[in-house]
Amino acid sequence: MTNGILQIARAAGEAVLATEGVHSLGTGRYAEAATYEGTEKFTGVVVKPDELEIHIVANYPLARSIPDLARLIRERVAAESGGRRTLVVVEDIEVANESL
């Protein structure tokens, strides 16, 4: 049995959110970044036939460089991607709220 694209998006999203340095999933800058199936959608992950597009907001200060964070995300979602190439889009940086 194969997973539906919404299941793939959700599983990938959970793996991404469990990654140190990821604040949240992004929504897309100029077009909505989401996967649709039936009447449901999952925002932050776009499942295409040959590609998985992950949109994130990273934490600042950074625990690792952006390229290292993207590599770690690709490793974490590899099992969920169904062999698709994974593209990581860093949409924004969320600065930690520090008390003065």
For each feature predicted by the language model, list its residue ranges.
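A generic secondary-structure micro-motif detector
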Residues: 2-3, 63
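Alpha-helical assembly-interface signal, strongest on the long, hydrophobic N-terminal helix that forms
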Residues: 4-12
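Short acidic amphipathic segments
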Residues: 12-26
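Short edge beta-strands and adjacent turn/loop segments
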Residues: 25-55, 87-97
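A short interface-forming secondary-structure element
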Residues: 50-68
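Short, non-transmembrane amphipathic alpha-helical segments
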Residues: 63-84
